[in-house]
Amino acid sequence: MSKRITLICALVFALAAGSAFADATVKGPFAGAVHAVGSLSDKSGNAISVTWDRGKITSLSDSSITLTRRDKQQVTFAITADTVVRNDGATYHLSDLKTGLVATVVSQGGPAEVIRNIRGDGAPSGADQSEFDGPAAKAITGTVAALYYDGSSQNFDYNRGRIQSVGNGQLTIMRADKQSVSFTYDSNTLVREGEGNIGSVDDLKVGEGAMFFSQGGLLKLVRCVHDAPSPQASGQPAPTASAAAAPTK
């Protein structure tokens, strides 16, 4: 079910509900989000603060980009030599952008770090796929506060790790900091694979890695599922099927 992916700043995938890879008939918890702030940390506890804004490009130059979000707010970011343009797994140039396209700008309290998830007529495409680590690539835990175009807001707990057990409405992961985190899930829990395709909690397997967005311990979204490492690569025997069905506390 799952596809091997490179974990980049994948929170942005979740924020970009308009992605052409996503099933438009299924709305995830970030559908309609225009702004989000991640208060995150890496496995050593170092803080990572990331902001995402999504909207239509209404002004663009070599030195700045302005988005008009769906809540009618305009946000402007400086563009530097370090600003990266990414779309559908490939890197592009600033000259590949134009006003009228919809994009997500990733920032960290300053200039645009990444411009990505670009949609609309003439959106850049066709370049070779390449790996890329965005600002939140090393984040394994934290919170994401999302603002929606209608003025409402929601907060989500964020964790990233590999599944240790899943079944009977409960799922436990192990993060890179060796901390175990347990969740509950229900029929409304959304699973999206790396390409945005809809999956099912029933298809999740022990050893698979993903990002987990929850509220009050209840999983709302499992994102960018990727395969468990092979026993040969890890030097460890593969978890047994019974482990996946083991109840968790």
For every predicted segment, state its role.
Residues 2-76, 88-182, 194-249:
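Short, flexible, surface-exposed loop segments at domain boundaries
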Residues 80-87, 186-193:
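Structured surface patches comprising rigid loops and adjacent beta-strands/short helices at the edges
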